[in-house]
Amino acid sequence: MNTVIELDDVALTRGETKILNDITWSTHRGEQWAVLGANGAGKTSLVRIASGKVQATSGSVRFDGNPINDLQPQELASRCSLVSLSTTQRLRASMRVIDVVRSAAWGISAPFVETYEDIDTQRARDLLGLFSVDHLEERPFHTLSEGERQRIVLARGLMSDPEVLILD
């Protein structure tokens, strides 16, 4: 099996606080994992490091055999998607649902989606249909229920057809 994500002696500190301490872990294509722990145990920090969203204080992170820091952010975002429920709070509230999903196509930030009209709208519609929320595509994101927002964020996470999907 091919190793997709590999962490070697990864640590993360914030000031004097050690968040993660010498984590070594890897995952291979086709595997499914669950990271369990108490609130504040570092689960979100771990998946954010594994997805390249946060840089470890020490240790190394590799994606598909390459140091994660050597990959362009856009390439990494298209190959490894991190879906976080906290995303629902960071998205621009007035955006239409279809634009929330489309904005993930190239790892662009949601407020600038208007300048990317060539993004694959049909793929976004297909993904909304997959999660049975296609009827909401023109609605402003902030008008949705929390459950609807979560399904929209899942569709958004699949927009780039990532090799790896990390759910937080």
Each model region followed by its residue ranges:
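Conserved ABC ATPase "signature" region
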Residues: 117-136, 161
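Helix-to-loop junction immediately C-terminal to a conserved catalytic motif
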Residues: 51
